[in-house]
Amino acid sequence: MRKKTICIIFGGISVEHEVSIISANSILNNIDLKKYRPVGLYLTKKGIFKNCKIITKSGKKQFSPQGYLISFKPGAKKPIEINKNMSIEVDVFFPIIHGTGGEDGSIQGLIKILDRPFIGCDMLGSAITMNKILTKELVKKEGINITKYEIIENSLSDKKIKMIKKNIGFPCFVKAANLGSSIGVYKANNEKELKLNIKKSLNFTNNVFVEEAVINAAEIEVSALQV
């Protein structure tokens, strides 16, 4: 039986670059090699694509970035061209870039142009859910309970602090609205921590929100294996 080639795209321009590398290597070490042939496509922090070879280090496989990618070939069975004599055949793309440029619909759009299937949400779903505030509002309109929150744009004012203390209270969480799930996220137990953490979060993005803490909550992760 012919093995399907899975192209794992990792790295990226976001601050979660290193986490993406860990994720890609984890997939590499857990994928069923009897069914699939994994290949790596690495995106540098400067936005340059590189092909990869697979090496073994300390008993674990890992992707090792090599030369620069020359071009993409939309619609081709071998959509990744390394040089005139070398192209990579891809059955399915597996984008594992975290945060900006990876989970916001950008890389999904590129794969759409290449006309190849990929794992994960489509462009629209990715773009919407990357914005936590927009996602909360859409969920709310569907009648699903959400935590109370206050939005902060660009800068912090004393008036906004008073609103947060009145409507949200402590403890609370400060979150960057449009970054990866753990970037620019801080817990505040008092007004001093609140002001400090809002300023820290605003270093990452102009859109920040403060959300009430949910006591004794359970976090549930759901994997969609097939749709």
Predicted regions and their residues:
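Short, hinge-like loop/turn segments at secondary-structure boundaries
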Residues: I55-G59, E137-K140, I164-I168, E191, ...
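ATP-grasp fold ATP-binding core
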Residues: V139-K140, K165-V185, N206-A217
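Glycine-rich phosphate-binding loop signature in dinucleotide/nucleotide-binding domains
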Residues: N85-V90, N167-I168, F204
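ATP-binding N-terminal substructure of ATP-dependent carboxylate-amine bond-forming enzymes
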Residues: M1-L124, I128-M130, L134, E153-K162
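Phosphate-binding site of ATP-dependent enzymes
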Residues: Y186-V227
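Short, glycine-/small-residue-rich phosphate/pyrophosphate-handling segment
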Residues: M130-E150
